[in-house]
Curated annotation (Swiss-Prot):
Family as reported in the entry's similarity comment: Belongs to the cornifelin family.
Keyword terms, alphabetized: Membrane, Transmembrane, Transmembrane helix
Function: May be involved in cadmium resistance.
Protein name per Swiss-Prot or TrEMBL: Protein PLANT CADMIUM RESISTANCE 9
Methyltransferase among keywords: no
Membrane topology qualifier: Single-pass membrane protein
Length: 148
């Protein structure tokens, strides 16, 4: 196990967040800075993982930008936080998902990124890479014909 893997290991307890909402500066400063500077890209990465590759990170990022332009980006992002919570049976804490994304979106995105990473899914790698390229364009295996 590499030193980096050891750093990312965190005891995962079902039904509990592995880190707090405001742990962004104490644990993963690079992700924290990234979500403050490029929240739409950070959101796109998280959405791609939560949608299991069905939604591309680019499309999700553009959707949150479009929704933000009419003041509803926080609502769109909060739906993905709810999806993450339901997937891992996490509590809606410290307050409602919408309120967290409305008032502290970068902290919410950083926490969601850390949560996925601690559970073995790194949003920065993307869905196909993380899952061994399951959706890559590999030609199907064709059995050879019968020989006489």
């Amino acid at each position: 196990m590499s030193e980096q893997e050891g750093k990312n290991e965190k005891k995962v307890t079902e039904g509990q967040w592995t880190t707090g909402l405001y742990d962004c500066l104490s644990e993963d400063i690079s992700t924290c800075c990234f979500t403050w500077v490029c929240p739409c890209v950070a959101f796109g990465r998280i959405a791609e993982i939560l949608d299991k590759g069905e939604t591309s990170r680019g499309l999700a990022g553009l959707m949150v930008v479009a929704m933000s332009s009419i003041g509803c980006g926080w609502y769109y992002a909060s739906k993905y936080r709810a999806k993450l919570r339901h997937q891992y049976a996490l509590p809606e804490a410290p307050c409602a998902d919408g309120a967290i994304h409305c008032f502290c979106c970068p902290c919410a995105l950083t926490q969601e990124h850390r949560e996925l990473k601690h559970r073995g899914l790194d949003p920065s790698l993307g869905w196909n890479i993380e899952n061994g390229g399951l959706n890559s364009n590999t030609p199907p295996f064709v059995a050879s014909g019968m020989d006489r």
